[in-house]
Amino acid sequence: IPDTVKKIAVLDKTKEPGSIGEPLYLDVVRAFYGKENAPMIVGGRFGLGSKDPNPSHIAAVYANLNADEPKNGFTIGIVDDVTNTSLVATDDIDATPEGTKACKFWGLGSDGTVGANKSAIKIIGDHTDMYAQGYFSYDSKKSGGITVSHLRFGKKPIKSPYLINKADFVACHNQSYVYKYDVLEGLKKNGSFLLNTIWTPEEVEEKLPASMKKFIAENNISFYTLNAVKIAQEIGLGGRINMIMQAAFFKIADIIPVEDAIKYLKQAVVTSYGKKGEKVVNMNNAAIDA
C-alpha cells in the first residue's frame, strides 16, 4: 500500500451478527495491525436485501472517507431506518458510456422473457458492431415469480458491472406490476415505456396509478400498450408472450432496423424451438409478425 494512502474502506457482502466486524474488514485490519502510520480503516456492508450497489453508492463511500470522522460499520444500497447505518447517495451518477442504450424488462417467471432477452443480446452481438451486456435478477420462486432483465447496447465497450439505474426503455410484461413495483424508477426523460395489458385505452387511463401517469407526463415518456396475452392465445402459444414482446421491443427501441431484427428473431426461433417441431416454430414466427 503506498504511503500516501491515509484511509481505507472495506466492503463486505455479508452480515456477521455478534462479530466485531465482517470477515474481509477484519482481515484488512489484521494486515495493518501494529504497523507504523497505518491508515484509518472503516468497514461497510453492501448487497443486503438483494440491493446491489451502483456508482452513486460508491461515491457515497468516498464521501464518507473524505469526512473528518468517517462512519464505521455503514451500509450502502438500502435505507436503514432502524439502526441508521446507511450512507445517503447524494450524487445521481450514470457511468455508462455516452450513446449506450439501457433497457429493463419486468417479466413473470416462466413467461419466456429472460430467454428472449438472451436471444436479443446474441442477435445484436452477432449481427452488429455494437457491444452488448445483460444481467438478470430473479426472486426466489422457480416459476411464477418476478424477473428483471437489464440489457445494455452501445458502440463503446460497456464496463458497467451493476444493474441498470438509468434506463432508456422499460417494458412491463405483467400489468399487475404497475400496482406492486415502481417499474418506471430510473427511466430517463424522453424514454419509452411498453406495457403488456388486457386493458383498453380507456381502461388504461382509468386504472393506471396516478403517480405513474404523472411521471409519464412530466418526463415526456413515450407510452405504448400491447395485449400480448390475447395475441399469444389466438396463435396458440398460451402464456408465452416472449416473442411478441421482443418484436415490439425491437420496433420501439430502434437499436437495429426492425426488418433485420425480425429476420434474426425468426432465425433464433428455429435455433431455440426447432426440435419441438414445425408447428411450434410457425406459431412463434406468427407471434413475431403479429
What are these regions (language model features)?
Residues 49-102, 281-290:
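Flexible inter-domain linker/hinge segments
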